[in-house]
Structure formats: C-alpha cells, structure tokens
A protein has these predicted regions:
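Glycine/acidic-rich beta-strand-loop module
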Residues: 30-60, 128, 132
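Structural signature of FAD isoalloxazine-binding scaffolds in flavoprotein oxidoreductases
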Residues: 57-72, 136-150
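Acidic, low-complexity central loop/insert segments
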Residues: 58-113
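Residue-level signal for inorganic ion chemistry
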Residues: 47, 68, 123, 193, ...
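The conserved catalytic core of RNA pseudouridine synthases
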Residues: 24-28, 46, 136-202
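Extended alpha-helical targeting/anchoring segments
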Residues: 117, 121-140, 145
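Accessory RNA 3′-end/elbow-binding domains used by RNA modification enzymes
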Residues: 1-10, 14-33, 37, 41, ...
C-alpha cells in the first residue's frame, strides 16, 4: 500500500506505538510517522505507508495547530501534568495580565527544547538522560508562533501533579487555567510554551492538556481512530481510504514533462528547462506527459541555465 493515513492518536500511546500498531493491522513493513506527538497528547498524526514515506520530511516541515490547556501555579520537570512539581507559586496575575503574557509569545523566538524530548545529543535521546536524573546543555531553536487565540481563562481548585514523599497525593491548591489555540512552526514544544508563560508571569506553569488539530493540510475532520482503521483493514477497505502523497504538495507549483524529458528525469538526468520559478520554494511537483505524478523536483541554476533535478520520486513501490 502507498499513501497516507491521517490518524487520530489516542492518549497514552507514543507516535512509535501507533506506527507499530498500524504495521500489524495493515501488514505494512514500510511505514513511518510524521513527527512526535507526546504520549499524553491526542490529535492528528499523519502516518505514511510505502512510497509515501518519502514525503515524511515535507510533512514534518509543515506548520501545526494545537489546542492547549495551561495550568498556572506550578511547574513540573516534564513541563506537563505527567511530571513532578519542581516549583509552585501563588497566581496573583489577573486575567488581563495572563492574556498579555500569553500573547507576548506571538512571533519568532528562541525556544529551549525540554529535557523530556526525543531530541538526540551524542546519540542519546534527551528523555532517556532525564529519566536517569541527568541534565545536559541544549541549544535554543528558532521557532515561530504565527498566532494565538485565547479561548478561556478561569480559576480552579485541583491537586498538583506528581506525589510527595511516600506517594502521598499532593494537596489541593488554587490555580488559574487558560485554554488557547496556537498556530506554530515545526519544532515548537507547546509544553515549553506553557512552562515559559508561567515563568514569565512568575508563578510557574505547565501544560495540562494538548490536542493537535492540524498538521499541514491534515486536520481532525479527516482523521481516523485506530478502531476505524482496524475495521477498514479487516474489510479490505483500508487502501481505498489512503490519501495520496501528492496532496502534501498542494501548495507547490507544477511542471509537465514530455515523454523524452520524463524518461531522462526518471533516470536521474538533469533537464534544462524554460521556467520562471518562485524563489521562496525551489521545489516543484513533476508530472509526465500522461499527467502521472512522478515526484518532487528541484529548480536550480547551474551558472548558465535553469535546470530541473529530482528531489524525491513517488513512483509506487
């Protein structure tokens, strides 16, 4: 099978767990996910099968939309509600101040990746080091928050995350919460955004809920639950529900090749072409003379001519 399944990831599963599950259900060896979604989070997780796995890097590069709940009054070691409290403070900020601080994160900024993340340093994932009690130096990464839409801010009484000595539940405390929608670039950690908001207010904060509502062009409306996917597979209907990898590149310009050009292109030959390309994106959808999608090409100048070379082939496996 070749194509994309837009999965509605449930809470409690890692992105790799979802891939392993679908590998068994679909009987598919060549399969991969398009970017880690926290185990506690739910939402859109496009999974690529067969030749569509060549589109993974392009989907990862797309912007994302999340809906998150921020709890103010405590910070945790994981920056979400699964961790233990490392700082707690009284929330004196009113609704206007909270909203002001949240909105101050809109724009391009440097974000320090959390220790509890899948980023690798010297071959080891950060979360593996964190579980061993280690903290290592990380470099901030450029991210962009395109927009934040605050949906609600309210007060609540709840127990702090984690346990105190002897596994005794934490006491109940007064907290403030904010529910907001954020549109951001790839590589943005919403947990870290919540942590940083709490730090800027001065009371500590952590992410208490997260749902990814969109990854690139794939949204909740087209997402399938694992139960739905299993039923489709049992009924031999899953392949008919796969989304073409071509859809990943809907916003790319396109070019059609003659029979002679297509033959050369498919054999890795650079083609001299007469084409005025958008400088902001060197990549282009390539079709043959029968309007069959061949893959993604790259437009470049060799010093004399405008040329086309293959970047990714999407001829079905």
């Amino acid at each position: 099978m070749n194509g994309i399944i837009n999965v509605l990831k449930p809470a409690g599963m890692t992105s790799f767990d979802v891939v392993s599950h679908l590998r068994r259900v679909a009987g598919q060896k060549k399969i991969g996910h398009t970017g880690t979604l926290d185990p506690s989070a739910v939402g859109v997780l496009p999974i690529c099968l067969g030749s569509a796995t060549r589109a993974i890097e392009f989907i990862i590069d797309k912007d994302k939309v999340y809906r998150a709940e921020l709890t103010l009054g405590s910070a945790t070691d994981t920056q979400d509600s699964s961790g233990n409290v490392i700082f707690s403070g009284r929330v004196d900020a009113d609704e206007n101040r909270i909203a002001e601080v949240i909105m101050s994160f809109v724009g391009e900024t440097d974000q320090l990746p959390p220790m509890y993340s899948a980023i690798k340093i010297d071959g080891k994932k950060l979360y593996q080091l964190a579980r061993q009690g280690e903290t290592v130096e990380r470099q901030p990464r450029k991210i962009t928050i395109y927009d934040i839409r605050i949906l609600r801010i309210w007060e609540a009484t709840e127990r702090l995350p984690g346990n105190v000595a002897g596994s005794v539940p934490q006491p109940e405390v007064q907290v403030k919460k904010a529910l907001f929608e954020v549109h951001c670039s790839k590589g943005t950690y919403i947990r870290t955004l919540c942590h940083d908001i709490g730090e800027k207010i001065g009371c500590g904060g952590h992410m208490s809920f997260l749902i990814r509502t969109r990854a690139g062009r794939y949204d909740l409306d087209s997402a399938l639950t694992l139960e739905e996917i299993k039923k489709l597979a049992l009924n031999k209907e899953l392949e008919s529900r796969l989304i073409s990898a071509e859809t990943v590149f809907d916003d790319f310009e396109s070019i059609h090749l003659s029979e002679k050009e297509a033959f050369k292109y498919n054999n890795g030959v650079w083609l001299k072409i007469n084409y005025q390309k958008d400088d902001t994106n060197p990549f282009i959808r390539v079709y043959d003379y029968n309007n069959i999608f061949l893959g993604i090409g790259e437009i470049f100048n060799n010093g004399q001519d405008t040329c086309l070379k293959s970047k990714k082939f999407f001829i079905k496996d």
